[in-house]
């Protein structure tokens, strides 16, 4: 099979993935949606072996880079490397991503069953994103603050960040350290390889094989990808939130920008509400006949509230994040 044919098939597959949800009632997209898209990309519980494909893909890429170096590159640049570099530094750089990747895969984040109510590790409810006495509809256990149910792992993960497809594991309380070390080790190994190969290529007096250029480009690309992803992860930590909470905060701030987020000044009501203005159909004067209803920011509370004393939030600084310790280091220490 030629590379051109393989490329065409790959593009066709991507097009089917993108269009099948839109044209799921039209053949041939309907067949693809029913037999491929739905069971493989939507249903978490069907064909669970698919969850190992991305970690296998990552492992294959990494092993290909190592193979290319040892079998096609090392012999051509051997004289350009220091002895200590060949026998110690290179092996040390190659091994950590593999070892830490395995460690991140097998390290289990804590869940609600590990949580003891009233313990010193318990996070308080902020009555904005999290409310007490809310039971997970699947686990049937009261959800601690900052927890989230993972449909793939089928459990409520404490301080849940996200389910990482690269290691097929939930990132949460108990394995943040392993996850961050895995990311940093990938950046360091790829960056070192890229810079060293680039330096050798620029200063070499002889023509180097194409494999050196290929490995240099691949390591450079993976350095950028890993660095961007790691930066985005750590930027969230700086703000005192998780990936899961970032989505919640975005929703809260969208309501604020629309002038629909209010804080109650009544002692007998939860603090935060969404304001919904409804126009009466038979109103003669629209501005004077608007009906205002308030809904709690608690997604599990569907009651209508009538507030008499409240203020409309106009700036993000008026919304406290009680989980933000103030500095990046303090937030990172709290997670790990």
From Swiss-Prot:
GO terms for biological process: cortical actin cytoskeleton organization; establishment of cell polarity; protein palmitoylation; protein targeting to membrane; regulation of exocytosis; vacuole fusion, non-autophagic. The chain crosses the membrane at residues 3-23, 51-71, 87-107, 180-200, 217-237. It is a multi-pass membrane protein. It is found in: Endoplasmic reticulum membrane. The keyword Methyltransferase does not apply. Residues 1-2, 72-86, 201-216 are lumenal. InterPro entries: Palmitoyltrfase_DHHC, PFA4/ZDH16/20/ERF2-like. The keyword Cytoplasm does not apply. It comes from the Eukaryota. One of its GO terms (cellular component) is actin filament bundle. Residues 134-184 form the DHHC domain. Its EC number is 2.3.1.225. It is an enzyme of class 2 (transferase). It holds the Pfam family DHHC. Keywords: Acyltransferase, Endoplasmic reticulum, Lipoprotein, Membrane, Palmitate, Transferase, Transmembrane, Transmembrane helix. GO terms for molecular function: palmitoyltransferase activity; protein-cysteine S-palmitoyltransferase activity. It catalyses: L-cysteinyl-[protein] + hexadecanoyl-CoA = S-hexadecanoyl-L-cysteinyl-[protein] + CoA. Residues 24-50, 108-179, 238-336 are cytoplasmic. PANTHER family: PALMITOYLTRANSFERASE SWF1 (PTHR22883:SF489), ZINC FINGER DHHC DOMAIN CONTAINING PROTEIN (PTHR22883). Belongs to the DHHC palmitoyltransferase family. SWF1 subfamily. The DHHC domain is required for palmitoyltransferase activity. Palmitoyltransferase that targets several endosomal SNAREs. Palmitoylates the SNAREs SNC1, SNC2, SYN8 and TLG1, at cysteine residues close to the cytoplasmic end of their transmembrane domain. May have a role in the cellular quality control of transmembrane domain-containing proteins. This is Palmitoyltransferase SWF1.
